[in-house]
Amino acid sequence: LMVPVMYGLCRRLTRRPWLAFVDGALIALDFMRFAQSRIATIDVYGTFFILLGALCMVWYCQTVLEKGVQGALLPMALGGVAFGLGCASKWTGIYSGAGLAVLYFGVLWARYKQQKPGFARELKLAFAGGVAFYVVVPLAIYILSYFPYKVHDPSFGLADWWNCQTFMYRYHSQLKSTHAFESRWYTWPMMLRPVWYYMGKYLPAGMFASIAGFGSPVV
């Protein structure tokens, strides 16, 4: 599903179908996406919703400049849902909110520079919609993502939900373990040291198994 989303995002940004096709083909052939999808890591869900949120935000920005905030409520709402699902998939989705916020407020400034009448009303609508769709809705989606816990254990409540959040934060903020194939972040664009996820052991004679994750520097 990342492929059509990337196609749509590139087409909205460039207005050129052939370039969007090339972009979609590049992500379709990206080994990192393929490997993580095949082994069902949770990262692929977060990445998908981050890309979907970016697509909706670009759609929102373009619509605001053409029709005003009142004509951009649909992409605003869909973008908020995508952002919430991304956060519910993995906390890395929260970081995408910074980029979305820059675009969200940046297009308001661009709209103001157009000097269209009724901007004050648009600004109020943008503020109300931003709080509703990018704060309230994502928070509700995140909390509801724990509903299976409630189904499994009816005694599960908000206190237990909060304990889950603090446990995850402590775990990731205090984690000291290392990985034999870890690499410095600045080497990632060129994939100088791809991560080796798995090497098969205790297999029958003559059998080998290996899973590695490395992306395309072009992407």
Indicate where each model-derived feature is located.
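Perimembrane helix-loop-helix junctions
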Residues: 56, 61-65, 72, 83, ...
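Transmembrane-helix signature of polytopic, membrane-embedded enzymes
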Residues: 6-29, 64-74
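Transmembrane-helix motifs of polytopic, lipid-linked glycan transferases
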Residues: 1-14, 52-56
